[in-house]
C-alpha cells in the first residue's frame, strides 16, 4: 500500500479527537493515528478531522475510519481531509475503492472475528485487514482462535481489548503485522492518557524489535 509500504510493523492509536491527543500519539512514536468519522463516542466531525489531519500530516500516518457510512460521505471526507489511508467497517463500495486507489490511499478492511464473511472475504482487493471483536471500540477482549484457522494474503492488524499488558502476547500468538488500540490507552472515551499511550506503543514496538532480532 502506497502510504504504509515503508513500515515493517504498524502500531495505531485510534479514536483521536483533538490536536492535543494527536501530538501525544506523535510523541509516543506510534505509526498511525485513527480519526473516526462513524457514529462513535470518539467521532470527529469533518471539520474537526480535517484540522487534526492537517496538524498531524507528515509526522504520522493518518487513517480515516468509517463504519457503515454512505459512500458519498466517505468520498466527501477523502476529498477534504488529508488522509494517508482509509479503514472500512461494513460494506466496501466498489466506486469508493476505485477513488481511494486513484488517490493512492491505503485501504484497510475491518472484519469482525465472528462475521459471516470472515472466512470468505477476498482480501486481495485491499492492502490490509483489521481483525476486531464483535463490538469495535468497546475495549472488550475476545478469542483469537479464528486467526489460527484463517490465513490472509495481506498484512493483518489486530484490535479489541488490547493494552500495554497484553499486546506483546497477542502479537506473539497471532503473528500480526499491526496492532490497533483505543480504549486501552484512554482515561475517558476519546481522551488519551499519555502514560498509557507511551507504554502501549513501547510494549508493541519492543516485541516487534525482538521478533526482528529472532528473524521472525
What are these model-derived regions, one by one?
Residues 1-216:
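Conserved N-terminal beta1-alpha1 strand-loop-helix module at the mouth
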Amino acid at each position: 500500500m502506497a502510504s504504509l509500504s515503508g513500515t515493517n510493523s504498524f502500531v495505531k492509536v485510534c479514536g483521536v479527537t483533538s490536536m492535543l491527543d494527536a501530538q501525544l500519539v506523535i510523541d509516543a512514536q506510534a505509526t498511525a493515528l485513527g480519526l473516526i468519522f462513524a457514529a462513535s463516542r470518539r467521532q470527529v466531525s469533518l471539520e474537526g478531522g480535517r484540522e487534526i489531519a492537517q496538524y498531524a500530516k507528515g509526522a504520522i500516518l493518518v487513517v480515516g475510519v468509517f463504519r457503515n457510512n454512505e459512500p458519498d460521505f466517505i468520498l466527501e471526507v477523502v476529498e477534504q481531509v488529508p488522509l494517508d489511508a482509509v479503514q472500512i467497517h461494513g460494506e466496501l463500495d466498489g466506486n469508493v475503492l476505485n477513488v481511494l486507489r486513484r488517490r493512492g490511499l491505503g485501504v484497510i478492511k475491518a472484519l469482525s472475528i465472528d462475521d459471516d464473511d470472515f472466512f470468505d472475504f477476498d482480501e486481495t482487493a485491499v492492502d490490509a485487514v483489521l481483525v476486531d471483536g464483535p463490538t469495535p471500540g468497546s475495549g472488550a477482549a475476545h478469542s483469537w482462535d479464528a486467526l489460527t484457522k484463517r490465513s490472509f494474503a495481506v498484512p493483518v492488524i489486530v484490535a479489541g481489548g488490547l493494552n500495554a499488558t497484553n499486546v506483546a502476547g497477542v502479537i506473539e500468538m497471532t503473528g500480526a503485522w499491526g496492532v490497533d488500540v483505543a480504549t486501552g490507552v484512554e482515561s475517558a472515551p476519546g481522551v488519551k492518557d499519555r502514560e498509557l499511550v507511551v507504554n502501549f506503543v513501547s510494549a508493541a514496538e519492543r516485541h516487534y524489535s525482538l521478533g526482528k532480532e529472532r528473524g521472525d
